[in-house]
Amino acid sequence: TQEELLQIRKQPELEPERDEASENSRLALEEMGICAVPFYKTVEFSENLAQKECARLEAQLQKAGILDALVVSETDFNCIRKSCPEFLDTVLYAHETGNGTFEGLQVSEELDAALKETVYRILTNLYEAEEGQGISLGADGWFRQGILTGRADKEGEPEFVGALARKRRKELKIRELESKICCAK
């Protein structure tokens, strides 16, 4: 547990668990100079959402396979498709701007212009009601992505969407481990 605590303290942020193939694919993209950012780092929750709504929305994104999917520019998307036969991960990419009016998420201001444009296109393909070709994320926890439909909810706070949420999650994990270590002595 002491070792785990040291490892967590060294990490800038805690990330969702990934399989080895995804980790290797992300390292390969980085080595190729491809900017690939997990979706949860490209967006922030809208200010008008309550904490419970944020947690539910994050749970929907996670269950639908969207939360940790990579966001890339159009150029990098085409490069991955053509030049990375070993790529084994998920990319969230919208070729065209949609007409979705989903207001639960907004583009992070920290992104470069190309990624901002990509995230904007993704967000315009999100809907609150089940309509259109995009992804629906209902306020009641139901979601639809193509033929995949489900419902998600989460107690507590969001853990990944938003820099503050990621910081709080890391601090909480450190406190939990410190408490375990202290109790074990």
Question: How should these model regions be labeled?
Answer:
Residues A21-S179, C183:
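Hinge-like oligomerization/junction regions that interrupt long coiled-coil arms in large cytoskeletal
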Residues T1-E23:
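Extended, EK/Q-rich alpha-helical coiled-coil segments that serve as long dimerization/scaffolding arms
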